[in-house]
Amino acid sequence: MANFNKVFDDIKDQVGGLAEKDLKDFSSQGKQDADTFLTQSRSKLEKWMQLLADKKIDEDEFRWLVESQKAAAQMEALRKANAGTMQIEKFRDSVLQIVVKTAITAAIAAI
C-alpha cells in the first residue's frame, strides 16, 4: 500500500486548499477544524486504508466507515467564528469526500 504518511499529507493539503477556496474569511478556522478532525481520526483512517488495500473491506465499506466519523468532525472553530451552518456542513462533507477519494485512489494504486 502507498505510504500512509504521504497519503495523509496529501489529504491535509487538499483540505487546506478547499478551506481557502470555499471558506474565504473563515479559511484559518476551517483548516484548524479539519486538522483537528484528521489528527483525531488518523489511526482509524490508517487501519481502514490498510484493510481496503488488503481487500478485507470494499470501497463502499470504507466510505461508510469514513462517513461514520461525521459526528467527530465538529468544526468548533468555524462555529465559534459564526460561519453559517450550511457552509460548515458543506465543508465538513467535502473534507470527508476528500478523505474517501484520496484513500481509495491510493489503495487502488497499491493493488
Report residues per predicted region:
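Cationic, hydrophobic amphipathic alpha-helical membrane-interacting segments
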Residues: 1-111
